[in-house]
Amino acid sequence: VCDGLAVNHRGMRYSLASRELICDSIEVMLTAHPLDGIVFIPNCDKIVPGMIMAAARMNLPSIFVSGGPMNPGRVQGKRVGYNEIYEAIGQYSNGTIGDDVLLDYENNACPTCGSCSGMYTANSMNCLTEAIGLSMPKSGTEPAVNAARRRLAKETGERIVELVKQNICAKDIITKKNMMNALATDMAIGASSNTVLHLLAIAHEAGVDISLDDIDNKSKATPQLSKLNPASDIFITDLNDVGGIQSVIKELAKGGHVDTSVLTVAGTQADRIAKAPNADGTIIHTCENPIRKDGGLAILSGNLAENGSVVKQGAVKPEMMDFTGTAKVFDGEQAACDAILNNVIIPGDVVVIRYEGPKGGPGMPEMLAPTAAIVGKGLDGSVALITDGRFSGASRAAGGGGVLVGCVG
C-alpha cells in the first residue's frame, strides 16, 4: 500500500492493516520456499515495519536495503515535499492560489521515484532500520536516483552471503540494546509519530520488552539534533550529504545516548560510525548545541487517552506548548475536513476527530487531509488537533506550530 495514494478515502483504512498482511505474506513465502538468507527491499510506510517484523518472526540471516528517498520538488522557486500538495488544496479553497499554482504543485512536488523527500514515516523507518543495524550505512538516506544507491544494493547482496556463512540471524541484531539505539535515533532526528506504533510492533515480534514508558524516558534523555521537512525546509537528501544516520549516531555516541558495542549486519556500531563525518552543526546539531534538549516525540496520557498518546513535540512552536481552546468534535475525518475547508474552524479551536481508531475507523487511518487543510488555511499556529486515529509523517501542522495528538493505546 502506498499511503500517498490511500489518503482521505476508504483505502486509508487498509493501510495499517497491510503491515500485518505484509509480515504474514513473507512468513508464508519463506516457510513454503526455504531460503538460507533474505534481502528485504522496502520503501513505504507499512512495508518497512512489516518486513522487519517478518525478519524477526522468521529469524533467518537478513539484511535490508531501501529503495531510497526521492529528491525534493521545486514549485515557485521553492523546494517542496509531497505534503505541500495537500496544503495547497487548503490554500486553493481559501483563494490564496489559483489553478496554475495548484497544477504546478501537482506536477512538480514529487519529481523522482523514491519514498517521499522528507522525514515522513517511510524515511523515518528506513533510517531506524539503519539505526537498529539491519542495513548498510546510507541505506536510510541515499537518494533513490543516485548511482550510489545501485552500489549500495550490490554491497548489500555481497553482505548477505557473509551473514549466511556466519549464521548471523535477524534476532541477533534486533536486541533490546539495538532497539534502544533506534529509539535514541528516533528522538534525535524528529521522526514520524508512527514510529512509536511500528517500533512497539517490531519489539513484540522479536520478543524484546519495550513499553511506552521506555519511549517517553528515552525522549526525556535524548536531545533532538535534526529537524527535517515537514518541520523545516531541510530534506533527507541534505541529511545524506552531511553523513546521514551514521553521523547522527556518532554524535549521539559522544553524548552517551547509544551503545556502540552492539552487533549490526556489518560489524559493530562502533565500526560503522568510525568512518562517518562529525556533525556539521547545521543539519545535524551537536549534543552541546541541540535543537532541543529532549527528543522529537513525547508520550502523553490523560482522561482523553488513558493508555497513552503521542505528540511530535519537536515540531511545535513554543507558544503552542500551553494551549487552551474551544473543542469542536467531529465523528470522522471527512466531517472535520469539510468544517476546516468551509471555514467553520477558527483560531483558538481544538479540532477533535473521533471514531478513527483501530476499531472505529476501522484501521486507524492517518489524518493528513485535515492537518494539511489546517496549514493551507493558515491556522497551523492557532488550532490544535486531537484524534484517536494516526498522523501522517507528512503532517506538519505541528511543524507550523499547531499541536497534533494521536492516541496509541
Feature locations, PLM:
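Long, structured ligand/cofactor-binding scaffold of large enzymes
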Residues: 1-66, 356
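Catalytic or ion-coupling anion/metal-binding cores of large enzyme and transporter domains
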Residues: 10-11, 15, 48, 54-59, ...
